[in-house]
């Protein structure tokens, strides 16, 4: 029987961020971890002949610096929800969950996770845009920030940054069932917590390691109780046999 290492048993750290405060904070939270210094994250993340399926069972963590910008204009086919200045941000690449249908499997050559620790530079890049116009920004498109919040603290920092900039609205999308954050973080009506939900059978079959749908719905209630606006996302829409029956298989949150 194949035995995998635990998640983040190996952490690759760019030499340029080895002394960065966020790098140190993240490493302090990891136990029994092998730390390997590298010159550039692409030396590991973009190397040839990686097995994404194998890596999904034992993800490595890569701590790096983004030097080319992280704020991108949203594509017309993506969900802007009527916002004119729609952007998305990649402060992390890849996800700790392993949904079979996820576009990230075809977007990245690796199943490992990259965290750009220089969040202050991303904020500076965004502030330059905010000086010109109001922005609607999706900050959790290429990763699930909520699911890894205990390690990075990025959700807390994004909320604090958004509260300081009245012409910024952000969406944080997740499949995590964490409820504790929303009573501990100060709410902001311009921080939308968006939960992707699926029928239980679909989630169990295809959304590996993600929280169960009812756990996500309960977390959405916790976010609402904490004062955050909440969005439920039925995405992607995938045809399934007996799909009409699946619509009624989840119990009510009130049960």
Task: List PLM regions with ranges.
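Flexible, acidic/Gly-rich N-terminal and inter-domain linker regions that tether
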Residues: 1-85
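Aromatic/hydrophobic pocket-lining residues that form the small-molecule binding cavity
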Residues: 122, 216, 246-247
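Cysteine-centered iron-sulfur cluster-binding motifs in ferredoxin-type domains/subunits
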Residues: 89-99
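A short acidic (Asp/Glu
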Residues: 21-24, 148-151, 181-185, 205-207, ...
